[in-house]
Amino acid sequence: SIEIEIDGVTVTTEESRTLVDVAAEAGVYIPTL
């Protein structure tokens, strides 16, 4: 697993997950096309 920080929120997740999915789970919206 890896630890990333998004908007000041530290999230631990698996390496195979996408950043957009992890951000959404943490309550952070990242606009996509």
Swiss-Prot record:
InterPro entries: 2Fe-2S_ferredoxin-like_sf (IPR036010). The keyword rRNA processing does not apply. Its EC number is 1.12.1.2. Tetramer of an alpha and a gamma subunits (flavin-containing dimer), and a delta and a nickel-containing beta subunits (hydrogenase dimer). The keyword Zinc-finger does not apply. GO terms for molecular function: 2 iron, 2 sulfur cluster binding; 4 iron, 4 sulfur cluster binding; hydrogen dehydrogenase activity; metal ion binding. Belongs to the complex I 75 kDa subunit family. It comes from the Bacteria. This is NAD-reducing hydrogenase HoxS subunit gamma. It is an enzyme of class 1 (oxidoreductase). Binds 3 [4Fe-4S] clusters per subunit. Subunits alpha and gamma of HoxS constitute an NADH--oxidoreductase. Transmembrane segments: none annotated. GO terms for cellular component: cytoplasm. Signal peptide: none annotated. It catalyses: H2 + NAD(+) = NADH + H(+). Keywords: 2Fe-2S, 4Fe-4S, Cytoplasm, Flavoprotein, FMN, Iron, Iron-sulfur, Metal-binding, NAD, Oxidoreductase, Plasmid. Residues 1-33 form the 2Fe-2S ferredoxin-type domain. Its cofactor is [4Fe-4S] cluster. The gene is hoxU. It comes from Rhodococcus opacus (Nocardia opaca). It is found in: Cytoplasm.
